[in-house]
Amino acid sequence: MKKSIIIAALFIGFALYTTSCSKEATAQTQISINNFVATYFPNEEVIATIRDGFDYDVTLSDYTQIEFDGNIVGKKLEWDEVNCKHSTVYTAVPAALIPTEIADHVSRLHSEQRIVKIAKDFRGWEIELSNGIEIEFDSKFRIREID
């Protein structure tokens, strides 16, 4: 009986500890998201932030969608994807978010197109152009696939 009470107390203590820590992380995460939006989308406001596991899905007032990876302990929040396809204001992903190598490739071979979506992960990058073409790059910016 005594063991059960101790185990229950430890479990409740752990649950309270993790709940309080996640609230702090959420407040810090929201500050990071707001700073990102102020930097790259200065005329927009965050209208929704949805936590999906460790990720945060953010919708801006112009319907731009941004996904952040919240699974990076002790590091700054990183964006995984920026999607301006449904934006009422931005017709392309802000240039400051696009690596130079990718921007150069698009300007050389797809000069009439804009990058409307960009995503990154440990394997590389993926972009979608305004004409619907999707291009995948590896981590060294070599083309892996064009769809």
Predicted regions and their residues:
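First exposed extracellular module after export/assembly in secreted or surface-exposed proteins
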Residues: 30-147
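Bacterial Sec-dependent N-terminal signal peptides
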Residues: 1-9, 13-40
